[in-house]
Amino acid sequence: MVSRRVQALLEQLRAQGIRDEQVLDALAAVPREKFIDEAFEHKAWENIALPIGQGQTISQPYMVARMTELLELTPQSRVLEIGTGSGYQTAILAHLVHHVCSVERIKGLQWQARRRLKQLDLHNVSTRHGDGWQGWQARAPFDAIIVTAAPPEIPTALMAQLDEGGILVLPVGDEQQFLKRVRRRGGEFIIDTVEAVRFVPLVRGELA
């Protein structure tokens, strides 16, 4: 049974244009309050981004739903997430596909996310501590890649790791950022601009 707060959020997301009911079902199934600090639990089902420490945030539910919807996932999709963060977006993906690969540059966040996912019995996720700019070459190619922080330009390594017909969704820019969708068609990459957004920057390298 979906709580009143969750139902209200889902209706808000529908009003904002989210149409994929499977994505909405995944949002309803994942307890967002488990991925944030106790001090913010009362705001868990509000449509806002929240801090998770280390200068990072958990994205607002609308943006999670929008980016996930743009990936056009099927259960068989091979998915790479860049920026595990709290693990919330990872959990949404894990409800929609058979397996998710996720890369996080901050070791502490990776550990916390793995613990949360395990507590929720989400075992179809592989996480890695590493530089998100480089993707996860050993697991490539991917049908879908989602990036939860903004590089100033689209990383070429991520485009190279897309399979034929694959989709990359990411925010791009410095002061001014736009959500982009990149689709691979043979040797070409078709890039569409979706909407203006605001994300933390995608930093190169990794932190212990």
UniProtKB/Swiss-Prot annotation:
Just give the chief location class: cytoplasm
Question: What is the protein's species of origin?
Answer: Salmonella arizonae (strain ATCC BAA-731 / CDC346-86 / RSK2980)
Protein name (Swiss-Prot/TrEMBL): Protein-L-isoaspartate O-methyltransferase
The record lists its disulfide bonds as none
Which key words tag this protein in UniProt? Cytoplasm, Methyltransferase, S-adenosyl-L-methionine, Transferase
Q: Is the keyword Cytoplasm assigned to this protein?
A: yes
The molecular function terms in GO held by this entry are: protein-L-isoaspartate (D-aspartate) O-methyltransferase activity
Enumerate the InterPro entries for this protein.
Answer: PCMT, SAM-dependent_MTases_sf
**Pfam families, sorted:** PCMT
Q: Which PANTHER family does the entry link to?
A: PROTEIN-L-ISOASPARTATE O-METHYLTRANSFERASE, PROTEIN-L-ISOASPARTATE(D-ASPARTATE) O-METHYLTRANSFERASE
Family per similarity comment: Belongs to the methyltransferase superfamily. L-isoaspartyl/D-aspartyl protein methyltransferase family.
Check the record and name the NCBIfam families matching this protein: pimt, PRK00312.1
